[in-house]
Design a protein with these regions (language model features):
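Glycine-aromatic micro-motifs
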Residues: 1-90
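Acidic, metal-coordinating catalytic segment for phosphate/diphosphate chemistry
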Residues: 103-147
Length: 290
C-alpha cells in the first residue's frame, strides 16, 4: 500500500496476523499508546534486537510477554527512591562495559562487566558479575479484621527443591508477576482472584523492596488485602493454564505469628507482610468495628 507522509508518497507494508481468530479490540489511539506503551516498547526492542540473527522468530515469539514484563520493570526502576542516608548516584558513578545474555526465557541471565565509583572516590575497575533478571512482582496477604484471620497459600517451589530443601512446599502470601501494562495494585487484585477467588475491599501498601539485590533484579511490591474471609473455605485452586497447584489455608493471626516464630513462614514477602500486619492490626480492627 502507498502512504503519504509530509507530502511524499512512499510504499509501506502492512502486518496482518496469521491467526484468523484474533478479535477486534478498542479503537487504537496513538496518544494513549504513547502514554502507556511507547517506553515499554523501546525497552522491549532493545532486548529483542540482541537476539537478531541468533534466535529464530518462532522461538522468540513465546518469550515476548516475559520480555515486555522485564522491559516494564526496567522502566519502573527509573522512579526516584529516597536517598537520605545512602549514596546518591550521579552521572558516571556506574559504567556498563559489556553485557551478555547466555539464557533468556521466562527469566533471563545476564553476564555484566561494570565499574563504579568507590566510597573513597576511586574507580572500582572492571567487575565481572552475573545477575538473574526477573520482572517485578506483587504480593498480597489477605486479612479479615473482623474474624482476625489471614489466608495463606501453599505450593511446591522449585527454588527450594533446587537448594536441596527436603520440604519444598512453601507457605506464602498470594503473589504473581506484574504483567505488561499492569500496575502493582492491579496485579495484586488479579492474583487474589486467580489464586484464591477473593475480592479485596481495600489494598494497603506494605512496601517495595528487592528480595536479593546482590544477584537478582526482582523487585517486590507487597500489600495487605483487607477482605471478608467469613465464608471462605480452605481449598485447592490455581490457574490450570499455568500448571498452578495451590492449596489455601485460613488461619488465625496468632497462628500466623506462630509460623513466623517457628520458621515455617520461611520467605521474605510473607515475613515482611506478617510483621507489617502485626504493626497495623489494631488500626485495621478499629476501623472495621467503627
Amino acid at each position: 500500500v502507498d502512504v503519504v507522509v509530509d507530502g511524499a508518497r512512499s510504499p509501506a507494508s502492512v502486518y496482518w496476523p496469521e491467526n484468523a481468530g484474533v478479535t477486534q479490540g478498542a479503537v487504537w489511539d496513538l496518544d494513549e499508546w504513547v502514554r502507556r506503551w511507547a517506553e515499554i516498547g523501546m525497552n522491549t526492542a532493545r532486548e529483542v534486537m540482541d537476539f537478531y540473527g541468533k534466535t529464530a522468530p518462532h522461538v522468540l515469539a513465546p518469550r515476548m510477554n516475559a520480555i515486555r514484563a522485564r522491559a516494564q520493570s526496567a522502566l519502573t526502576a527509573q522512579a526516584h527512591p529516597p536517598t537520605t542516608l545512602r549514596h546518591r548516584a550521579g552521572p558516571g558513578d556506574v559504567t556498563l562495559d559489556s553485557i551478555g545474555r547466555p539464557y533468556a526465557d521466562f527469566f533471563a541471565l545476564e553476564d555484566l562487566v561494570v565499574r563504579h565509583t568507590r566510597f573513597d572516590g576511586a574507580d572500582s575497575g572492571p567487575l565481572e558479575r552475573a545477575i538473574f533478571v526477573a520482572p517485578d512482582a506483587a504480593t498480597v496477604l489477605p486479612y479479615d479484621p473482623v474474624t482476625d484471620q489471614v489466608l495463606l497459600i501453599e505450593q511446591f517451589r522449585v527454588g527450594a527443591f533446587g537448594r536441596g530443601d527436603p520440604q519444598p512446599w512453601s507457605l506464602e502470601a498470594i503473589a504473581g508477576r506484574i504483567d505488561p501494562g499492569e500496575t502493582a495494585s492491579e496485579a495484586a487484585i488479579r492474583e487474589a482472584q486467580e489464586e484464591a477467588g477473593l475480592t479485596l475491599s481495600d489494598l494497603v501498601p506494605v512496601g517495595g523492596y528487592y528480595c536479593s539485590p546482590g544477584a537478582k533484579t526482582e523487585f517486590l511490591h507487597s500489600f495487605i488485602g483487607l477482605t471478608d474471609l467469613s465464608d471462605v473455605k480452605s481449598g485447592i485452586g490455581g490457574l490450570a493454564a499455568e500448571n498452578e497447584d495451590i492449596r489455601s489455608h485460613i488461619i488465625s493471626f496468632d497462628a500466623l505469628m506462630a509460623l513466623v516464630e517457628s520458621g515455617e513462614a520461611g520467605n521474605s514477602p510473607l515475613l515482611i507482610s506478617a510483621l507489617q500486619l502485626a504493626r497495623r492490626r489494631a488500626d485495621f480492627q478499629a476501623n472495621a468495628s467503627g
